[in-house]
């Protein structure tokens, strides 16, 4: 599985995709407020929610889930 997270100026978006051969299927997606005072808070809130877990870090460390991330914010962060 792959999770894509985009940190925007207002919203942090996360989407979970399943790999089926060369096809990707959207499994889940969430939208959470961007926490401009500490970006990691909103980032991990989105990540945990899209994976439906309390702490996504073990899944990332084990390689069970791949992570792709970006920022579409225009200034301000």
Show where each model-derived region lies.
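N-terminally biased helix-coil "hinge/interface" segments that flank
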Residues: 1-77
């Amino acid at each position: 599985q792959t999770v894509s997270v985009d940190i925007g100026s207002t919203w942090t978006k996360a989407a979970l995709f399943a790999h089926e051969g060369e096809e990707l299927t959207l499994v889940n997606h969430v939208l959470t407020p961007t926490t401009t005072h500490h970006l990691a808070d909103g980032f991990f809130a989105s990540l945990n929610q899209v994976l439906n877990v309390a702490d996504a870090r073990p899944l990332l460390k084990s390689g069970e889930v791949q992570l792709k991330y970006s920022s579409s914010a225009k200034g301000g962060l």
